[in-house]
Amino acid sequence: WPAFAPMGEALPLKGYNTEDDKVVNSNPAYTSQPNPNQVVNIAPDSERLQRLAPFAPWDGNDFTHLPLLIKTKGKCTTDHISMAGPWLRYRGHLQNISRNLLLGAINAFTGEAGIVTDSLNSNKCEVWKVAEHYRNECGGSIIVAEDNYGEGSSREHAAMEPRYLGVKVVLAKSFARIHETNLKKQGILALTFVQPSDYEKIKEGDTFDVACADIHVGTPIQIVVHHTDGSTDNITAQHTYNELQIKWFKAGSALAAL
């Protein structure tokens, strides 16, 4: 073997050749604007396809009196949040596929999967029905979870469904990184407990006041938990939003912020 070290330049002296401009300019699709008069026809009775409506922007106020939708226990993957299998035929119809919301999630109070108690009428039913009821009657709801919430495949529907059904906040001990970002993209406030043991303070029938009106990068969020017996608990939560992600939240979603 030669006794001398290989010789050569670590990087090209004149930099790398790039022809991005040529690529962009050669394809009208990169520079043209969509035709606002173009009509996409979807059968009104289609079960598979539904035109998406933009999510509403945040009104700038604290979230108050948010009812607890579900307190999940243990592992809660994206498949627990939005099951695949036969549900995939509805992936182009947000209203229909949202009926699988948290079907596999374990209710921390009962040990049942996908069934919760509606605090407005005491009925026990699927999570999506209660979420829809809270959205219509209370303006939204909150999900409380344990560690690594949203682990598994990075399916967007696991964030789009709760957003569609009015979930405003997900408060967890920790998040799977990609799902946390997906929640941010859909305009849901993703928070973690500063003290993970505060998870134990959450009781069935609780409502939440989330002080997010003054949200800034790196600042904690104060939460007041109201219990059915009239007592309260104060909880400090934290977030990982940067300036761009806060703009997503304010606009209602990342897409709306574009």
Describe the predicted segments one by one.
Residues 1-258:
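Fe-S-dependent hydro-lyases/dehydratases of central metabolism
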